[in-house]
Amino acid sequence: MHRVAMCIVSSGIDGDAGGAWPCRAGVVKCGEAPLKQEPPMPLPDITARINASTTAAGRSPSSVHLIAVSKVQPNDRVEAVLQEGHRVFGENRVQEADSKWPGFRELYDGIDLHLIGPLQSNKVRQAFDLFQTIHSVDRPKLAKAIARIADEIGHCPDVFLQVNTGEEDQKAGVSPDQADAFIAECRALALPVKGLMCIPPADEESSLHFALLAKIAARNDLAGLSMGMSGDFESAIAQGATHIRVGSAIFGERQYG
């Protein structure tokens, strides 16, 4: 059985009164308080912004799923969000998720974990044990590996297919002109394709990429759109996002290193 190591934090941040918290090597050292950062936005404020955006778009607030992106976040911050009742989280790496979430699942019921970062083919089986949804199916080789493991064990996480809407060399995902064929291939493999995911270029207007992703999804009868992050999720909702991936706005700035 997995266990999350505990550390004693003598004084907390972001409203935390201190106490015993799970800790992860390399982010929060046992016996030390986390580094002080700018306070995150209260979760109810994020929810209010989502509600306002969905109302403006003529949609129900329940049509948008808030994924709290906890990658590289100190576990005291993650625990604080869990204590507020939120249960939908996103991680970027299988290894980090495996070091963190089995322990939290011993303490909290109903955790819904989403993989939003790149997945290596040799990590697929491990990902099946951790995640309910994989947002980053970005190439045929990975799709085939997922289908093979699903056949072996009899179940499969929901999947989103990643489209490189900006056609950037440094980003994963199929190009927009390859998306229709990739969707068809994944469906032929009997993968539970729920929608599409994109990460717009940092120096371009996000809404143009959200609109492109929505157009590709619509012509392929896909309802799910995983798009929008802390700085642009309201624009994504206006373009039809069903899953928004919000990290720093909830948890504060990440602590790398």
Predicted regions and their residues:
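Short, basic/aromatic-enriched C-terminal tail that caps enzymatic domains
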Residues: 237-257
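Extreme N-terminal basic, low-complexity initiation segments
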Residues: 1-13
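N-terminal polybasic/positive-inside topogenic patches
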Residues: 7, 30-31
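Conserved alpha/beta-domain cores
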Residues: 36-223, 229-231, 237-239, 253
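Composition-driven detection of intrinsically disordered, low-complexity segments
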Residues: 11, 34-37
